[in-house]
Amino acid sequence: MRSTIIVAFLTAVLLGCGNAPARAVQQQEDLKQDWEVQPALWSPRAILIPHSAPADSAASDTVTLLDSLLTHSRAALSDSARGDSAKAGVKSATAAGRPKKRGLFNISPSDSALWPVKAPPPLPGSILPEHRIVAFYGNPLSKRMGILGELPPEEMLVRLEKVATEWAAADSGTKVLPALHLIATVAQGYPGPARKYRLQMPDSVIRRVAGWAEERGWLMFLDIQVGVSNVEDELKVLVPYLKYPHVQLALDPEFAMKDGKRPGTDWMGRMDASEVNHAIGVLARIVEEHQLPPKVLVVHRFTRNMLTNASQIRLDPRVQVIIDMDGWGTPGSKMGAYRWFVVRHPVQYTGFKLFYKNDKPMMTPQQVLELYPKPVYIQYQ
């Protein structure tokens, strides 16, 4: 009884009156009006270390960059706080690199032949494959959900730029774009007012993280854990945010519960290609209606059953789809999962997740770059 009262209190604090439909509709209308008068000034500011840069020079440049980051971050966060209170080029698809004959990761010729995937050519303004995205995952309201919330914002943002710079050095010549991957809809064991076993983040949290990304020229991902809700309903709430050019989308099948199961149990959730296709359709319409660059959609996966009928995912040039290998463990087990559940079920692009605490040991950028195809999306939790 006591735990129920505590959870209910926290829900009320986060969401005010809970998930009342009238409040959600009004919130979206206010948001829509706000965005309609704000020009889309965002443009990506990637990190690039040229092929020709000597190793010592690259390291020196990295140190100089990091020395200046803390001062910049403090000023930016101060400006953001005041604001809150006051109110392509196309890169060849083969650039992922053919698999090496020797190394940590070896795949068969038949698996290698699946890549690169036949897909619509990237449209102007596309993030992929010209960039590699390096993201910090989590939620600023929780220290247990990932590094995005585990560290103070100022420290977290500086650390993300440092990690992204390390990736740029490890794969010189490839642009690296940092990203903040926010769990915007959080699956939970408590049913909540809507009895959907999920908690929608309030506008203030989403806007805060979006502002951090926007002012730095980074990306932001809104991650949906639907609980016992569905992609269609949960996506409607986030559509206004997705009108920003730097805001992207992610789906987490692990917490898409079916057959009466609940989050937080031993049961694994799953999504079907039809649900992914719905998200692709929504994103494509947003891109078309608001004349935005193509969106990026990340779908987490670390078992075969998490994503059913993956071969039926319908690609659209306005949406670039990444299947992100989301499992933790030893390097060998992670590479095996990447081979079995991502490489052998090609969709379009690939991602790879790294866990600071659960990977034993955590793979280095150089080790991850041994994978084929090379992941274009790297996520840290």
Predicted stretch roles:
Residues 166, 175-254:
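Substrate-binding cleft of extracellular glycoside hydrolase catalytic domains
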Residues 253-292:
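Substrate-binding surface in catalytic domains of secreted glycosidases
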Residues 18-199, 315-319, 332-381:
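Alpha/beta catalytic barrel-like cores
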Residues 1-4:
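Positively charged n-region of N-terminal signal peptides that target proteins for export
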Residues 7-14:
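Bacterial N-terminal signal peptides
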Residues 203-206, 242-250, 273-277, 318-333:
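Acidic, His- and aromatic-enriched active-site or binding-groove loops in soluble protein domains
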Residues 226-231, 288-306:
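Aromatic-lined carbohydrate-recognition surfaces of secreted/lumenal glycan-active proteins
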Residues 139-141, 183-187, 225-227, 254-256, ...:
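Active-site beta-loop-alpha junctions enriched in small/polar residues
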